[in-house]
Amino acid sequence: MVMKKILIIILFTLLSTNSYGVEKKTNFTKEIFNKAKSEGKTIVINSYEEWCYTCTKQVKVLNEAEAKFTDIVFLSYEQSKHEDIGKLLNIEFWTTIVVYKGDEEKSRLIGVAKKKDIFNAILKGI
């Protein structure tokens, strides 16, 4: 009986942790970023952590945006594993979304996960 309870606890822990995991991978490189800037493209950068609930919500919205805005460059990176990128972009916190149009930063959100707010921030860069 004790073993059964332990297995249930382990299973519950694994399932609940997995449901918050971010299914996003780092695709940010300086080369891609600099090329998109020099071409005057709209760029959306997302800083996340795999375990972060808000990040998971943001990723879902950003995936929708990426499907809708096919001419925008979407870049992401895991903050704790790529602090150099955070320093380059002056991003201190995960859950940060920054929108550029070429060289110019057009909007910055921290901790915002509502679709309307994220889409409005992206539209400022178009």
Describe the function of each predicted region.
Residues 6-15:
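Sec-dependent N-terminal signal peptides
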Residues 17-23:
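Sec/Tat signal peptide C-region and signal peptidase I cleavage site
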Residues 25-41:
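A short beta-strand-turn-helix
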Residues 38-50:
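Short active-site neighborhood of thiol/selenol oxidoreductases, capturing the structured segment around
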Residues 47, 71-84:
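Thiol-based oxidoreductase modules, predominantly thioredoxin-like and allied folds used
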Residues 56-68:
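Typically the conserved alpha-helix immediately C-terminal to a functionally engaged Cys/Sec
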Residues 89-98:
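Structural micro-motif
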Residues 101-126:
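Non-catalytic, surface beta->alpha helical segment in thiol-disulfide oxidoreductase systems
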